[in-house]
Every structure is written in structure tokens, then in C-alpha cells.
Amino acid sequence: MTRNEKAEIISNLEAEFKTSDAIVVCDYKGLSVKKLEALRNSARELNVKVQVVKNTLANIALNNCGKSGMELKDTNIFVWGEDQLAVTKVVAKFEESNNELFKIKTAHIDGEVASVSKVVALSKMPSRDELIAMLLQVWNAPIQNFTIGLNALREKKEQTA
């Protein structure tokens, strides 16, 4: 790889990492190409990006955009995106199904280095749309119960009449 190619990769990664709210680094050693493609496809559906990058190039890009502090060793695959929950859900779900070959190593979330346990905890949280649905269900329940009660009262009065 020439110096110009490396510089281009670094600048592309910098631009991507600056706009991302979550960057997760995982070990993928021994994972088949078919499974890597499955990861990329599931990530693409949620607007999450997945790329294998050399550690030195990734480290330079991370340092240049102010997201340093992650220790990069061995083989790494980078998963990032603007939606923290989407990134963590993609990674955690894939780790569950490929536990022996795919491991979460470290992450950069909310401007700080995050542990594996934080990534897993974030992945279990409901998404924004799910939270809105829960809230609407809570708001709707009293009205629904009231109308059911009124309907039962009406039916009872019709039976007695």
C-alpha cells in the first residue's frame, strides 16, 4: 500500500469517525467470509458501517478526530455509526451467535472509552421507537380501560332492559 493510499484511508476514516457516536472494536479471528458478509448485511440495514482496518491507520484516524485511548492489538474489525444503540445491538447480536470467533474488545461511546459490559448493557436497551411505543401504550391504557368499562355497563343495562 502506498503512502497516498494510506493517507486516503486515514482521511476517509477520520471523516467517518468524526460523525459517529459509537465505535466498537471487535476481534474476528477465524470468522469465515460468509459470516463477515452476514455481519455487514445486518449492519447495513441499520445504517451501521463495518470495516477491517490496519491498527496503525485506525489509531492515526482515531487520534486525529479526538477519539483516542482505545488499545488496538491483533486483528480488529471496526463497527461504527451515528446511532449508539444500533451499533451496539448489531455487535452484541452477532457476538451471541458467533461467540467463539467474534469478541467485543473495546469501544468509544459518548466521547469516552467504554468497556465491553457497557456495550452489552447498551445493546439491551430499547430503541427510541420502542420507548415511544411503550409510552403511548401507558398513556392509552387508562382510556382503553375506561371505554371497556363503559361498554360493559351499557351491555349490562341492555340485558336488564
Swiss-Prot record:
GO MF, any single term: large ribosomal subunit rRNA binding
Pfam families: Ribosomal_L10
Stored SUPFAM superfamilies: Ribosomal protein L10-like
Keywords: Ribonucleoprotein, Ribosomal protein, RNA-binding, rRNA-binding
A single Gene Ontology CC term: large ribosomal subunit
GO term, biological process aspect, one: translation
The organism's place on the tree of life at top rank: Bacteria
Keyword rRNA-binding recorded: yes
Function: Forms part of the ribosomal stalk, playing a central role in the interaction of the ribosome with GTP-bound translation factors.
Assembly and binders: Part of the ribosomal stalk of the 50S ribosomal subunit. The N-terminus interacts with L11 and the large rRNA to form the base of the stalk. The C-terminus forms an elongated spine to which L12 dimers bind in a sequential fashion forming a multimeric L10(L12)X complex.
Family to which the UniProt record says this protein belongs: Belongs to the universal ribosomal protein uL10 family.
Protein name: Large ribosomal subunit protein uL10
Species classification: Bacteria, Pseudomonadati, Campylobacterota, Epsilonproteobacteria, Campylobacterales
